[in-house]
């Protein structure tokens, strides 16, 4: 039996690698991205620019840095990236809430295991003028712990897997893979000023 020579194998491997890159590029182009800001009253928006969250006016000018507790301020300063699952606030019982995912690098060594990965935590912030008060937090993605948000086969940003629900008021989170659990859907219902896991409404 003849064995393919090394040049032939190299050509096949290069073609396969090129096909994979083209496929990934096509998926990236088709992906529905997460919002880069959250709309608030008066044409303003909340955006992240390292190391803080800012209130940005209609012209794009930063007007005010949101005041947050020290622990969240440190998390934002150390973040590798920040994402907004929804482009709008959610008003519940007369109070406005904001969803934000703060990511940090999985590994301080870029060439190590999970060096390019991230560990993400969802925060639900209650807005009080220029203050943002965390009312709930939840780890939602992790390279180290094999936790990944749903992407609909790569067609959408993983942050789109975190959504507001109207009735009952709360947050739906869908994971493509939750360690030792596979695909998972959980609901966090608003109650007494915070959010707690509850049965997923039918």
Residue ranges of predicted features:
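N-terminal signal peptide c-region/cleavage motif recognized by signal peptidases
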Residues: 25-27
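Acidic/hydrophobic-patterned starts of short beta strands in beta-sheet-rich repeat architectures
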Residues: 92-109, 169-173
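Flexible low-complexity loop/turn motifs enriched in small/helix-breaking residues
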Residues: 31-89, 102-103
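Acidic, small-residue rich beta-repeat scaffolds with periodic aromatic anchors
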Residues: 30-59, 132, 137-202
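Beta-propeller blade termini
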Residues: 82-92, 159-165
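Beta-propeller blade signature
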Residues: 116-129, 189
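Short consensus segments that form the blades of beta-propeller domains
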Residues: 44-45, 109-117
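Bacterial N-terminal signal peptides that target proteins for export
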Residues: 2-16
């Amino acid at each position: 039996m003849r064995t393919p020579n090394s040049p032939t194998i190299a050509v096949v491997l290069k073609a396969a690698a090129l096909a994979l890159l083209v496929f990934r590029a096509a998926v990236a182009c088709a992906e529905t991205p997460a919002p880069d800001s959250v709309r608030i009253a008066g044409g303003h928006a909340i955006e992240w620019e390292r190391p803080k969250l800012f209130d940005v006016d209609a012209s794009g000018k930063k007007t005010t840095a949101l005041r947050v507790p020290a622990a969240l301020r440190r998390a934002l300063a150390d973040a590798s990236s920040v994402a907004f699952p929804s482009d709008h606030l959610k008003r519940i019982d007369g109070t406005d809430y904001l969803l934000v995912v703060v990511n940090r690098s999985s590994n301080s060594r870029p060439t190590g295991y999970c060096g390019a990965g991230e560990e993400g935590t969802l925060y639900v912030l209650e807005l009080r003028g220029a203050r943002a008060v965390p009312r709930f937090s939840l780890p939602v993605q992790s390279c180290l712990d094999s936790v990944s948000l749903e992407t609909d086969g790569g067609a959408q940003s993983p942050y789109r897997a975190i959504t507001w629900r109207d009735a009952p008021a709360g947050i739906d989170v869908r994971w493509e893979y939750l360690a030792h659990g596979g695909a998972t859907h959980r609901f966090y219902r608003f109650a007494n000023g915070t959010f707690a896991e509850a049965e997923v409404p039918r």
